[in-house]
């Protein structure tokens, strides 16, 4: 299980910059900063209402660097320090003062072919990595990966939260979409279960070997 986007491997395009790689897509990073009073907008996190957010990757990185001490003693800090030092060769501890130098070094690396997603996958000797997708996902990126001829094994995992958690935003519409997608009547219990069986079979056919769940507690009623 890895928090990666299958589009990374399907496109195999260079990562745009250090902020787009380490901050904006990583909820372990931006949630920590948000919990300490940093606005998500200042980290480039899109708003639901479409209002403007910070787009300057260097400014986002500077905000991150100025508050990097907040990660002290966390697993996230260990992961980041390891990546900065061993993958990108950063020799300076990340601080407000060293922010630009580290940003520029990482960006210079990301421009090289050996730092593209598939190259990093191979460099790390990853045998298999599972992404996680909604039952409503067509898995187009996984289809493209299969057709590409690349030997790296990137599989999906079935994450049904949008259609099993009534508190999930858009739950009702998602259940209706599930029915339309599978041609099952999800207004009935049997039809709802049949729709899940249909999508699970599709995910399995696309390589899935597991499910993934985001329940905040073990309570079911």
Could you say what each language-model-derived stretch is?
Residues 2-221:
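Metal-cofactor-binding active-site regions of metalloenzymes
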């Amino acid at each position: 299980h890895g928090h990666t986007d299958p589009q990374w491997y399907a496109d195999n395009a260079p990562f745009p910059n250090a902020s787009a790689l380490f901050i904006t897509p990583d909820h372990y990073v931006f949630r920590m900063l948000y919990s300490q009073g940093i606005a998500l907008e200042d980290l480039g996190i899109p708003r639901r209402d479409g209002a403007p957010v910070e787009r300057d990757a260097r400014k986002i990185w500077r905000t991150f660097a100025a508050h990097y001490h907040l990660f002290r003693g966390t697993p996230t800090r260990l992961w980041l320090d390891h990546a900065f030092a061993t993958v990108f060769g950063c020799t300076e501890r990340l601080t407000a003062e060293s922010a630009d130098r580290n940003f520029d070094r990482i960006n210079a690396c990301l421009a090289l072919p050996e730092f593209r997603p598939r190259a990093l996958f191979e460099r790390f000797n990853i045998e298999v990595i599972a992404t996680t997708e909604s039952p409503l996902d067509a898995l187009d990126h996984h289809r493209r990966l299969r057709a590409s001829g690349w030997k790296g094994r990137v599989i999906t995992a079935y994450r049904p939260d949008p259609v099993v958690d009534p508190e999930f935003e858009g739950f009702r519409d998602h259940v209706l979409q599930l029915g339309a997608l599978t041609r099952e009547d999800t207004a009935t219990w049997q039809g709802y279960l049949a729709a899940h069986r249909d999508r699970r079979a599709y995910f399995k056919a696309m390589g899935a070997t597991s499910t993934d769940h985001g329940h905040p507690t073990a309570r079911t009623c």
